[in-house]
Structures are given as structure tokens and as C-alpha cells.
Design a protein with these regions (language model features):
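Active-site neighborhoods and metal-handling regions in enzymes and metal-associated proteins
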Residues: 1-596
Length: 596
């Protein structure tokens, strides 16, 4: 019997003992983070599925895992023998719709409220007939559960920061005043790290630390494991108006609040915290002020980001030169080797801290899984002709990077060249766009996809996401996807850092995705001044596209001009840094030649 099937049976026993008819297991921690500490990987524990997102529901008779289109193929394989069935999540098939349809008023739905988004609790109360019960049934089963992270917290040096934490706190308090609120609770780790100018190592790839922050009129309380903060840093925090409390004291402190207007962002707040509040507390639901403040990078941050992109670009030139030579020498290279070597070259930078996410290195048919991850148990060697997709990034003191490139192993065939060029056309289409400031970002996605739609091709993931500044590689509020709702918070603002990553995925054949990071930049000297401000996307990623995979007949003159200008900039910024690396310089020179 599968270990996961055994765990499901044990869970059902606990459900029966506690009169629970259905138990919902979310991919979440108390901060609703994208990447979770090992301690909070409940969904992985019960199902074995390690994708970045997914929701498990267990009843006495059935078990389901809902995942979106990125993970359908991967999840189908992993769930074999677990007794958990794959549910292909889309707009019509969600776990909330299943609960609404299948649970009755006399049944009880168990959920750990410490991991339940407040917004989801509200939705379930409205649409799910069953009674909700706060209960943790995973902890009793998980005997060898990892401990909570104990990594030290450190300062992000002021030379890299846009403002001091004292200044940032004042900016947030001004926003609070504008909203007529006297207290503000933040649980999202990137917001807290940005506001305090602190960083940590509690979550893989994201330099954040487990904490909550309660901002009052006269002080700010930082709830954190105090063993992670040395006495010198604590003194600095006190001088700037931040006072430490133990991480697990948050509920007790919230219970003390009374007769205050409390600002929260419901999509970034768990039900357990808000359910602990006194009835006299008036809750004001708005996006965290810090989210908009950190999303719009200022000129100082943008300058540092551009420096980080040079560091990353140099590492990539060295990496691709190594790969080219290894293939020419017929070395046996695996997808796992790609991951290791990319990290090795990035680590040569004095600014490097870590990778910014788990590298995706997929060869041929493996790249058809948009979020494929090679493992020691399942990986491919680069043995034959084909396409290798590499999606990788780094965390540097002066910025966060995220880039995807596709390179041929051997010689690309005509169909592969066609698909590569089509994705490049989509990439250039949105990269060349000029658009009104404050437009809802999801509306821009059609510009990207238009070249693909002309050939009745589409891809199942978003085109772009926000990126943090030495913070989370996936950051809001902007999102570039027509599948996302058009909301006030998704407006395009000057200074935002966003990814552009269209793709084509052909199951059993290959996957092609081409990704740059871009800065939302104001159009200077506009042709017309009567219609408000306009923005465009300025690429900051520095790495050439693969000209051997481009069918120049498919590109018009403006597309060629964009590509040549981009490659010219890449060469001019990277070549001076490669004087001591002749092989990397030769690799760069070959791929930045103008096309006609």
C-alpha cells in the first residue's frame, strides 16, 4: 500500500473520531506564502504531490486534488496508487464549486483556520452549506514533522534600500491616516521584510522570515522568534519604532485590541487571526499600503536592479558557453547538471544570495510541462537533438532575477524554429507596446497572445507577474493574464518590475517559453499630451535570444529592429565584463549579431 494511501486512511480515522465529514487541506502557511517552509507542506505530506499549488479534499469515501493546467500531467503521474483523484481545475471545476454542490447543511467541513485565507472563509460561509470547523488533523499524523525554521534575521543594507524603515513606517502611517484607520495588521512576509528593511532565510528562494506586524499609532509590534534577532539589531529596531514580540503571541495581542479601526488585506490574512478580534474592532479591508509602495520601484532601486541584471547576464553567458562546449565535446549532461551549473555561475557574483526559485530545466518533451522539475528519480539526459528550456533566477543584494531561454541541443528542426519564432513574436509584441498609465494589466495580455491566436495556439499560464526587489520572485499586485479579474489593484504603475513570458507547449514534443523582466517606464516627449501619461516596457534582463532558432522571414521590419536593438544593448552592457572569460565573450558575440 502506498504511504500516501495509508496516510489518507489514518486521516479518515481522525475525521470519524471528530465527526468531520470532509477535510480541506490547502497549500498554505499562516502567512499565505507562495513558497512554504517544510513544516507547513501539509498537502505534500498527505498526497505526495510537490507542485507549487494544489488543494486536497478528503471525505470518508473519496479524495481529490485540484490543480491548474500547469500541473495536470505531473499530478496524474504522482497520484497513482494514492487513492486521491486528480481534478483538473479551471473556471468551471474548482474545489469551492464541489463543496457547494456536494456538502449539505447537516455536514461538517474541517479546516485548519490558521491556514485559511479570510477571503476563502467568507466565500465558504456564503456558498458552502456545510458548517465550518477549525481543526488541525495533520499535526497528529505527522510524527516526524520538520521543525520551524531557525535562521537568523539580517539587515538589508541601507545603501540598497529605497528608504529607511523609519521612513517606510511613516509612509504607511500616512496611508493609514488617509483611510481613517488607527491600526494595521500585516502577515504577508514580503510586505514585512520590505517595510522593516530586514531579510531572512525561513523560506526557500525568498529572503523572508516568519513574522506578523501590527502597526499602531505610537509603535509597531513585530511578532517573530526572538532568537533570530541579535541584541544589536533589536536596539536599532527599537530606535526606529519597532518592538519585538514572540511569534506565538500574535493571537493574545490581537485579543487585546478594542475600539479601533483595523486595516487588513483579506486575501493576505488568515481566518484564525481575524476571528480572535473583539467585536468592537472595526475591520477595514483594503490592499496593504506597503504592497503598492514596494511594487513601484524608485530610481535608486531601478539602478540597483539594472546592476543585478548585469551580474545575472554575465553568469548566464558563462553558463551557456560552458553548455555549448560540453555538448560539442559530447559530455553526458543531465537536466540536474543544468540546475547545478546555473547556480554555480550565479554564485560567483559577490552580490549573490541564493537562487530565486527552483530551476526548471526541461529537455524536449519534459519542457511541455510548464513547471516541470527534474528530480533524482526522474530526469533526462541531453542525448539527442532537441530543445532545452531553462527557467532560472537569482536573489542578489541588489535585485531579483527571473529569465527563461530555450537553446537547441544539436540542430533545431523546421517546426521547432517556427514555434520558437512565433513565441518570440509574442514576446516582442508586448515588449513593444505603449499603453495608458493605470490600465488594468490583465487587459494587456491579448497583445502578447495575438500572434499565437492567429495560428489558433494558446498557453495555459499567465503571461507575466510582478517581481520583488531582493524579495519574492512572484509579487503583486500586477498580473499579466487575461484569466485574472480586472481589479483596481492591478493597474499598471510606473516603476513596476514585471515578467513577460509567452510560450508554446506541445505534449510529447517540446516546450518553448521566452522570458524577460521589464520595468514600466514613462513615455518621455509624448506625441500627444492631451490624453494623460503613457508607459512602455523597458527590458532589464540581459541575455540574447537564440538566433539559430529564428526564422527571419516570419519577422517584420519593426520586430527585427526591436531584436537588433535589444541584442545591441545586451552586448554593450555585458561584453566589458567578460574580458577575462573569452569563451563566454565569443558565445555572446555570436548571438548578438544583427539580423536582416
Amino acid at each position: 500500500m502506498s504511504i500516501y494511501k495509508q496516510r489518507v486512511l489514518e486521516l479518515r480515522r481522525l475525521m470519524k473520531e471528530n465527526n468531520i465529514d470532509a477535510y480541506l487541506i490547502l497549500s498554505a502557511d499562516p502567512h499565505l506564502s507562495e513558497y512554504l517552509p517544510e513544516y507547513y507542506k501539509n498537502r505534500v505530506f498527505i498526497s505526495g504531490f510537490k507542485g507549487s499549488v494544489g488543494t486536497v479534499l478528503i471525505t470518508q469515501e473519496e479524495g481529490f486534488l485540484w490543480v491548474d493546467g500547469r500541473y495536470w500531467l505531473q499530478a496524474q503521474k504522482k497520484l497513482e496508487g494514492s487513492g486521491i483523484l486528480l481534478q483538473k481545475q479551471d473556471a468551471k471545476n474548482t474545489f469551492t464549486k464541489w463543496l457547494e454542490k456536494n456538502l449539505s447543511e447537516d455536514q461538517i467541513l474541517g479546516i485548519d483556520f490558521a491556514l485559511l485565507p479570510l477571503s476563502l472563509q467568507k466565500d465558504l460561509k456564503i456558498n458552502c452549506k456545510a458548517n465550518l470547523k477549525h481543526i488541525d488533523l495533520i499535526s497528529p499524523l505527522w510524527k516526524d514533522r520538520p521543525t520551524l525554521p531557525q535562521e537568523k534575521i539580517y539587515e538589508h543594507e541601507l545603501e540598497y534600500c529605497s528608504y529607511s524603515r523609519k521612513e517606510k513606517l511613516a509612509l504607511v502611517r500616512q496611508k493609514m491616516k488617509n483611510l481613517n484607520v488607527t491600526s494595521h495588521l500585516i502577515s504577508s512576509l514580503d510586505d514585512i521584510a520590505w517595510l522593516t528593511n530586514l531579510r531572512g532565510n525561513d523560506v526557500n528562494y525568498n529572503p523572508v522570515f516568519l513574522s506578523h506586524l501590527l502597526i499602531l499609532e505610537d509603535k509597531a509590534l513585530l511578532f517573530v522568534d526572538q532568537k533570530k534577532v541579535n541584541s544589536e539589531l533589536e536596539k536599532k529596531l527599537n530606535l526606529d519604532g519597532f518592538w519585538l514580540k514572540n511569534y506565538d503571541e500574535i493571537i493574545m495581542e490581537l485579543e487585546k485590541l478594542a475600539n479601533t479601526n483595523l486595516l487588513i488585506e483579506p486575501s493576505k490574512m488568515t481566518a484564525l487571526l481575524i476571528n480572535s478580534l473583539d467585536k468592537s474592532v472595526k475591520i477595514i479591508q483594503e490592499i496593504n499600503p506597503s504592497t503598492h509602495l514596494k511594487a513601484a520601484k524608485n530610481t535608486k532601486e531601478i539602478a540597483h536592479i539594472q546592476d543585478a541584471m548585469i551580474e545575472d547576464g554575465v553568469a548566464l553567458c558563462k553558463f551557456f558557453a560552458w553548455l555549448e562546449e560540453a555538448i560539442e565535446n559530447k559530455e553526458l549532461i543531465s537536466e540536474l547538471d543544468i540546475d547545478v551549473k546555473a547556480s554555480e555561475f550565479r554564485a560567483q557574483s559577490k552580490y549573490y544570495i541564493s537562487d530565486s526559485f527552483a530551476t526548471i530545466a526541461g529537455f524536449n518533451e519534459n519542457a511541455a510541462y510548464p513547471h516541470y522539475k527534474a528530480t533524482k528519480e526522474s530526469f533526462a539526459y541531453l542525448k539527442k537533438d532537441g530543445l532545452l528550456l531553462i527557467d532560472s533566477g537569482g536573489q542578489y543584494k541588489n535585485g531579483t532575477t527571473d529569465i527563461t531561454r530555450v537553446v537547441p541541443i544539436g540542430k533545431a528542426n523546421a517546426e521547432q524554429i517556427h514555434d520558437y519564432t512565433l513565441v518570440l513574436k509574442a514576446h516582442i509584441a508586448i515588449s513593444s507596446a505603449i499603453f495608458p498609465k493605470d490600465i488594468a494589466m490583465p487587459l494587456l495580455d491579448a497583445i502578447t497572445r495575438a500572434p499565437l491566436w492567429k495560428e489558433q495556439i494558446d498557453y495555459i499560464h499567465g503571461t507575466g507577474h510582478g517581481v520583488g526587489y531582493f524579495l519574492n520572485v512572484h509579487e503583486g499586485p500586477q498580473v499579466l493574464s487575461y484569466l485574472s479579474p480586472v481589479l483596481e489593484k492591478t493597474k499598471a504603475k510606473e516603476g513596476m518590475l514585471t515578467s513577460i513570458e509567452p510560450g508554446i507547449y506541445k505534449v510529447g514534443k517540446w516546450g518553448i517559453r521566452l522570458e524577460n523582466l521589464v520595468i514600466h517606464t514613462k513615455v518621455e516627449n509624448p506625441k500627444n499630451k492631451d490624453f494623460g501619461e503613457f508607459l512602455y516596457f523597458k527590458p532589464v534582463t540581459l541575455c540574447p535570444f537564440e538566433i539559430s532558432c529564428i526564422d527571419t522571414k516570419m519577422l517584420d521590419e519593426k520586430e527585427k529592429e526591436w531584436l537588433n536593438n535589444y541584442h545591441k544593448e545586451v552586448f554593450e552592457k555585458l561584453s566589458p565584463k567578460l574580458g577575462d572569460y573569452p569563451k563566454a565573450l565569443v558565445w555572446l558575440e555570436k548571438r548578438t549579431k544583427a539580423i536582416f
